[in-house]
Amino acid sequence: HYYGWSDIFSGDDWYGNLQQMVKTNFLQAALIYIVVMMIASVVLAVPGVTFAIIAGAIFGPWWGTLLCVLSATLGAIAAFLIGRFFLQDSLRDQIAKNRYISRLLFDKNTKNEMMVLMITRLVPLFPYNLQNFAYGITDISLGKYSLGTFVFMIPGVAMYTVGTYALTGASNKLLYIGLTAAIVVAVMVLSKTLRKKYVSEEE
C-alpha cells in the first residue's frame, strides 16, 4: 500500500502515519528526502539544520544521519561544480567580503586542504552555502572535496538527528539524550580547539 499525502496528514496521528509510510516505502521516502534537500540547500539556501531535524524525526538516528550527510554532500558537490564552471568572477567578490574564508581558502601559506575543509565544516564562522560555492574556485580536487565534506559533516549532523530522535521517537530516551550530549560536547570542544589554533592565527 502506498500512502498519499492526504492519507498521511488525515486524522490526528499524522506523525505516526508519516513514520509508517517511511517504513513501508523506505527507498521512495529516502529518494524524495535526498532530492528535496539538494534542491532546497543549493537553490533556496535552506539551512541544513532544518533537514537534519526532519531526518532524525522520520528516519531515526542512524539512517537519518546517513541520508542527511549524503544529501548535504550531494548538494555541496552541485554548488562546488556551479562555482567552478559558472560563477568564478562573481564568487571572488563575495568571498572577499568574508575575511575568514578568503584567507583560509586562498592564502598560499594555509594549512593542507583537508585541514581547511575540517575547519570550515566544524567552526561556525563560515556561511555554509557560500563555502560550498567558494571551494569551486580553489585548487582542491572534486574527489578530495567530496570525501572531506562527507566525513567532516557527520558530527554536526549527528548532533541534530540523534537529538531529534531522542525527543521524538526513542524508546530509550536517556540513552539517546546522553549520546546527544556527548556529541555536542565533542563538537564544541573540537570547534573551539580548531578556532583557537587556526582561525585566531588568521585574524
PLM features: residue spans?
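Alpha-helical transmembrane segments of multipass membrane proteins
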Residues: H1, A40, L44, G75, ...
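Membrane-interfacial helix-loop-helix
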Residues: Y2-Y33, T73-L130, I137-I140, G169, ...
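Glycine-rich loops and low-complexity Gly/Arg-rich segments
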Residues: L142-K144, N172-K173, V184
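Extracellular/periplasmic helix-loop-helix junctions in multi-pass membrane proteins
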Residues: T161-I177
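Hydrophobic core segments of alpha-helical transmembrane domains in multi-pass membrane proteins
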Residues: G178-A182
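Hydrophobic alpha-helical membrane segments of integral membrane proteins
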Residues: L27-L70, D107-A166
